[in-house]
């Protein structure tokens, strides 16, 4: 009598997927990314997290939320570099995805197709309310999209917009509370009008 046969062992295969966490500044995107990555580590999964090398606001190497929670990361200049670090990885985290080049879309697709869980966090819109970097395409190819919201600093409603409070028209301006504030649609439109910006 055979009590245990290899025929009955089901091989656990990795299931790749793409998860996107998007929203305005101060909405908890990085916080949620860190939470998911730490849960994966607790489950003994092999994880690697990446951030754009240009983001040195809180740390040159770690991913750090506005609430000062952090996780070790690898800063990179090009999305293609991610593939160099992921041969033995189960879960890949990517923070501030809006700052990466459009090659990130194919990189994430390739990782997921190879059985890797990819968790992406980033701004879905820039300070003008326009889609930001590769985020729209990443949302389109994602298996799951979580839109998180901040609280409007003017009225307390849910905030979806990142209003820039300093005079600078560059799309990329790394900043914190001194440069940006989260606003709901109504307060954002009002603030843009007061700034003399096109709405």
Swiss-Prot record:
Active site: 96 (proton acceptor)
InterPro entries noted in UniProt: P-loop_NTPase (IPR027417), Thymidine_kinase (IPR001267)
Chemical reaction(s) catalysed: thymidine + ATP = dTMP + ADP + H(+)
One Gene Ontology MF term: thymidine kinase activity
Subcellular location: Cytoplasm
Binding site for ATP: 23-30, 95-98
One GO-annotated biological process of the protein: DNA biosynthetic process
HAMAP family: Thymidine_kinase
Quaternary data: Homotetramer.
Family the UniProt entry places it in: Belongs to the thymidine kinase family.
Protein name, as recorded: Thymidine kinase
Record organism: Bacteroides thetaiotaomicron (strain ATCC 29148 / DSM 2079 / JCM 5827 / CCUG 10774 / NCTC 10582 / VPI-5482 / E50)
Gene label: tdk
């Amino acid at each position: 009598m055979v009590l245990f046969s290899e025929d009955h062992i089901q091989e656990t295969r990795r299931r790749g997927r793409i998860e996107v966490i998007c929203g305005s500044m101060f909405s908890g995107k990085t916080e949620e990314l860190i939470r998911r990555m730490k849960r994966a580590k607790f489950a003994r999964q092999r994880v690697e997290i990446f951030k754009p090398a240009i983001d040195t606001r809180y740390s040159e190497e770690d991913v750090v939320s506005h609430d000062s929670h952090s996780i070790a990361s690898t800063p990179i200049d090009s999305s293609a570099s991610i593939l160099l670090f992921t041969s033995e990885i189960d879960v890949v985290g990517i923070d501030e995805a809006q700052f990466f080049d459009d090659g990130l879309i194919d990189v994430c697709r390739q990782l997921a197709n190879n059985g890797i869980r990819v968790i992406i966090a980033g701004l879905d819109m820039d300070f003008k309310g326009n889609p930001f970097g590769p985020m729209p395409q990443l949302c389109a190819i994602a298996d799951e999209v979580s839109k998180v919201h901040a609280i409007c600093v003017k009225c307390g409603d849910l905030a979806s917009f990142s209003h820039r409070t300093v005079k600078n028209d560059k799309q990329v301006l790394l900043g914190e509370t001194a440069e940006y504030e989260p606003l709901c649609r109504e307060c954002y439109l009002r603030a843009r009008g007061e700034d003399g910006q096109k709405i």
